């Protein structure tokens, strides 16, 4: 991921046929963490999410509930806002595809494609999955089902088509000239293989249902839900207006980064169809499609039939919002599948958050109060060298931002854990409780260095566990304006100030054995 001054990051808009699950929470969390890091780095950030509310699947789900589609989507869309609130996601815009601004954007994009001869009317016959809202070729079916396991049905109807086949070579050029356009590389290779195998024109309208945006000039047709959904990335920056400030700043700007973060199940729509549509409409492309894996539950695929669907809101209430955020980022490597286990989650909370970081904060500030009445001691800065050197903030920050550029969230966390472990080992080695009797000047030095360790940890933790990091920095009395990444290297804890008595930041989770 490139890190320009303007930074636009998006989740896919979520399909509202059911309640939010752990996959939705994870995608949004990744975007939220990146957005928070970028804000701390002084970037101009826009983070968007939303709900995809049109299509046959929604129409069926609403009918099953005895509701009108709009009434149904109004209800379920709220649950995705509640997820964002419960997980402390700081988005800047929430797009609903039923909004008027979005319909205008979709129609404008359709018209651009039509004006450029990229759309034609014909008839379609083939396999279609209502669950996936996707068309599949015969060769893609596995045991009569979609590659995702979804049921498919044979449909034949009049349809508008997008000339996708015209853009095969341009797409291959894009992937070659911009090697990081699809990340990680394994997903890029998957897409390149698919495109090289040959592209056929894409059916982009349906006549067998009514719930959607009508094709301009032919309201018998509804625009294909994925054309509708993908356009949200333009809607949020003010399209169809191409002269607006947000469009110019976040989309049509070589010195901006715009990243779509998605799950691997919707890779083809974002990495093949979307750039082809934008190229055909003569519109700028996103800079990157970042693709994460799925979550498994105790090693098994999550599904309603297995009864192992994971409710993120329930988990946040049970263990804490920051604890859940931490675990999801710590446990999974970006691009690979993660395995959810309550046992592992409790282990991470207790060993890394409570026993390591939480213990460091508690024991350091408690000792400060016991020996110095809570006053940060004045130290001779010339003594902070060699083994007594302060943490190398620049090297730490460079590592963290390098990991961020590759979405290595678990490596950022490991970096922080290592800093905390180093600080705890320093306490044991320095034995400040002994120095209090023999060398108080050195004791003061040890305390000051430990407080600096904690300051660095607190600043780096802000995007990951925002509330807990705020508690840490508040206990150090770090001014709000000194909590950004620039201040990580350019500021330090104030001498002579009195810190409040410590408040536990991370509590242990009692295990069954302990109970």
Task: Give the residues covered by each predicted segment.
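A non-catalytic, amphipathic alpha-helix used as a structural packing/dimerization or gating element
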Residues: 33, 71-82, 356-363, 395, ...
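Cys/His-rich short segments
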Residues: 116-168, 172
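Short secondary-structure capping/junction motifs at helix and strand boundaries
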Residues: 87-96, 114-127, 139-140, 154-155, ...
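Structured secondary-structure scaffolds
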Residues: 2-49, 101-105, 148, 152-370, ...
């Amino acid at each position: 991921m490139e890190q320009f001054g303007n930074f636009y990051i998006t989740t896919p808009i979520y399909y509202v046929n059911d309640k939010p699950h752990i996959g939705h929470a994870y995608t949004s969390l990744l975007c939220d963490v990146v957005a928070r890091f970028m804000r701390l780095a002084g970037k101009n950030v826009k983070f968007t999410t939303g709900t995809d509310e049109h299509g046959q699947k929604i129409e069926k789900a609403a009918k099953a509930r005895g509701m009108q589609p709009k009434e149904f989507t109004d209800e379920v869309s709220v649950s995705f806002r509640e997820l964002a609130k419960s997980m402390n996601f700081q988005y800047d815009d929430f797009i609903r595809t039923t909004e008027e601004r979005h319909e205008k954007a979709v129609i404008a994009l359709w018209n651009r494609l039509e004006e450029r001869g990229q759309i034609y009317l014909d008839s379609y016959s083939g396999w279609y999955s209502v669950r996936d809202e996707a068309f599949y070729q015969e060769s893609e079916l596995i045991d009569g089902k979609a590659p995702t396991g979804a049921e498919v049905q044979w449909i034949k109807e009049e349809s508008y088509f997008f000339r996708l086949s015209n853009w095969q070579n341009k797409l291959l050029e894009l992937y070659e000239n911009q090697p990081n356009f699809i990340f990680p590389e394994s997903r890029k290779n998957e897409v390149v293989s698919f495109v090289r195998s040959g592209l056929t024109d894409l059916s982009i309208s349906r006549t067998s249902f009514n719930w959607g945006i009508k094709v301009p000039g032919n309201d018998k047709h509804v625009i294909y839900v994925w054309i509708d959904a993908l356009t949200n990335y333009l809607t949020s920056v003010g399209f169809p207006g191409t002269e607006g400030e947000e469009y110019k700043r976040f989309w049509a700007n070589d010195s901006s980064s715009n990243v779509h973060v998605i799950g691997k199940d919707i890779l083809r729509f974002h990495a093949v169809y979307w750039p082809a549509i934008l190229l055909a409409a003569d519109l700028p492309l996103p800079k990157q499609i970042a693709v994460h894996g799925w979550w498994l539950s105790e090693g098994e695929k999550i599904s309603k039939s297995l009864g192992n669907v994971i409710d993120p809101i329930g988990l946040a209430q049970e263990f804490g919002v920051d604890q859940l955020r931490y675990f999801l980022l710590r446990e999974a490597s970006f691009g690979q599948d993660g395995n959810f286990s309550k046992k592992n989650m409790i282990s991470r909370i207790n060993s890394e958050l409570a026993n390591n970081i939480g213990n460091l904060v508690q024991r350091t500030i408690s000792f400060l109060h016991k020996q110095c009445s809570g006053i940060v001691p004045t130290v001779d800065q010339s003594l902070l060298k060699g083994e007594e050197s302060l943490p190398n903030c620049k090297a730490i920050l460079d590592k963290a931002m390098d990991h961020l550029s590759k979405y290595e969230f678990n490596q950022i966390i490991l970096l922080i854990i290592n800093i905390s472990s180093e600080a705890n080992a320093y306490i044991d080695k320095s034995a400040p409780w002994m120095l209090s009797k023999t060398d108080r000047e050195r004791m003061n030095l040890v305390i000051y260095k430990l407080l600096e360790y904690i300051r660095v940890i607190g600043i780096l933790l802000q995007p990951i566990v925002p509330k807990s990091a705020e508690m840490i920095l508040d206990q150090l009395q770090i001014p709000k304006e000194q909590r950004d990444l620039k201040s990580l290297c350019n500021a330090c804890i104030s001498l002579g100030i009195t810190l409040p008595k410590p408040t536990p930041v991370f509590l242990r989770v009692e295990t069954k054995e302990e109970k």
